[in-house]
Swiss-Prot record:
GO terms for biological process: 5-phosphoribose 1-diphosphate biosynthetic process; purine nucleotide biosynthetic process. Pfam families: Pribosyltran, Pribosyltran_N. Binds 2 Mg(2+) ions per subunit. Its cofactor is Mg(2+). It comes from Saccharolobus solfataricus (strain ATCC 35092 / DSM 1617 / JCM 11322 / P2) (Sulfolobus solfataricus). SUPFAM superfamilies: PRTase-like (SSF53271). The keyword Transmembrane does not apply. This is Ribose-phosphate pyrophosphokinase. One of its GO terms (molecular function) is ribose phosphate diphosphokinase activity. Homodimer. One of its GO terms (cellular component) is ribose phosphate diphosphokinase complex.
Length: 291
């Protein structure tokens, strides 16, 4: 067995190599003057079982194309089996047609991964697990809840775990149960044209004097977390921490979250966070346990 580290790994390939005691080969990659990607696998992999690590955070389209190129090259070079470890799977939120005529982007991406020869697909915290049914091979879903719960307990003595919508409640419950913390949820709705988020429903929860941790799968523009943070403080919260498995933080999201009083940000290395102000958890151990 061999690990192939792609063009975007955030160190997960190196960590897996150490955890699993498997040799690591890094792909050679560069960008041509016209913007196209060059990929080369600089090692013999014939008859090998290959673990390919490639996340697809920003720039998503570049990293996806390189994932497809690397995967098919691995099969062309005679690998016996190919497992693609894609810690963050881009386009996962476009899993249906919200408006007539829209592309179902995740469907296309998963079809391509099937066609280029991926036998097993490993994804960390997909937006909706059922969307992965478009992939034709074996699926493995990684939930790094234990690592996140442990980090929360390390920095907050008595946390209250809050899901920013009903869909995130199961995640919040599992993390809360790991550390015997109370939990609840609020309900939001999003305008599909403007993207604006507003609170639709808030159960009768007591947050007075609580250190609240809002946990979601993805924090992108931060609109949902901004609204949830305002609500938490209006209900008497002492502090608010925002945590996500995939901490994208696009378009000034970090600054917006700080402005409304988010004290601490927690993410993982599924995304290239590269910010010393953000607590970043390595999900490699959770991935290794799934293999």
């Amino acid at each position: 067995m061999i690990i192939i580290g792609g063009s975007a790994t955030n160190g997960i390939d190196e960590s897996l190599s150490k955890i699993l005691s498997i040799p690591l080969v890094k792909v050679e990659n560069k960008i041509f003057p016209d913007g196209e990607s060059y990929i080369r696998v600089p090692s013999s992999i014939r008859d090998e079982e290959v673990l390919l690590v490639q996340t697809t955070d920003y720039p998503q389209d570049k990293h996806l194309i390189e994932l497809f190129l690397i995967a098919e090259t691995i099969r062309d070079l005679g690998a016996k089996k190919l497992t693609a470890i894609v810690p963050y799977l881009a386009y996962s939120r476009q899993d249906r047609r919200f408006k007539d005529g829209e592309a179902i982007s995740i469907k296309t991406i998963l079809h391509i991964l099937s066609e280029v020869g991926v036998n097993t697909l490993v994804v960390v915290e997909p937006h909706k697990p059922e969307e992965l049914s478009y992939f034709k091979g074996e699926l493995k879903i990684v939930h790094p809840y234990h690592q996140i719960a442990r980090k929360i307990k390390e920095i907050i003595e008595d946390p209250f775990i809050l899901a920013p919508d009903r869909g995130a409640l199961d995640r919040a419950r599992k993390i809360a149960e790991e550390i015997n913390a109370p939990y609840s949820y609020i309900e939001k709705e999003r305008d599909r044209t403007t993207g604006e988020v507003r609170i639709k429903e808030a159960p009768n929860i007591n947050l007075k004097g609580k250190d609240v941790v809002i946990i979601d799968d993805i924090i992108s523009t931060g609109g949902t977390i901004v609204q949830a943070t305002r609500l938490a403080y209006s209900l008497g919260a002492k502090s608010v921490t925002a945590a996500a498995i995939h901490l994208l933080l696009v378009g000034g999201a970090k600054e917006r979250l700080r402005e409304v009083g988010v004290k601490t940000l927690i993410g993982t290395n599924t995304i290239n966070v590269n910010d010393k102000d953000i607590i970043t958890i390595d999900v490699s151990q959770s991935i290794a346990l799934s293999l």
